[in-house]
Amino acid sequence: TEGITLADIQETIGGLAPLPGARGFLDRLREQTQVIILSDTFEQFATPLMRQLGWPTIFCNELFTDAAGYIGSYRLRQSDGKRKAVVGLRSLGFDVTAVGDSYNDLTMIETADSGALFRPPRSIVEEYPTLPSFTEYDGLLHFLTVDTRADPAL
């Protein structure tokens, strides 16, 4: 897109607001557990929204600009990065619960110890009827914070 700098794009993104209730949801969730956002976006696009969300940890891709601020190239951290991040966290002994809303989240959700959908398109709900699906933050928060698994140490 000629004539548009990264700063121009960030200014536009900075005018967007997170979904109503998103900040409160993340704040309540972070009181009870660690949260990592895995995204296919770019750090530079995510920054304005992450600021509004209280700077949650986000793993995503990266853009590179030239001296004039125009996007020159990008770096995708790795293919299927969401799934690979879950594999890595599980290999470190973490129980991982993944939540997504689109087809590109399914390998991550299926690789996690547990997973759910949040406000997905109807087509995904119909194709994956065994995945819990939520439309409201309170239901998702309950799913994420009520541990139904028995403690293996007991």
Feature roles, as predicted:
Residues 13-14, 19-154:
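C-terminal cap/substrate-recognition subdomain and adjoining C-terminal extension
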Residues 1-4, 8:
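N-terminal helical cap/lid subdomain that shapes the substrate entry/recognition surface
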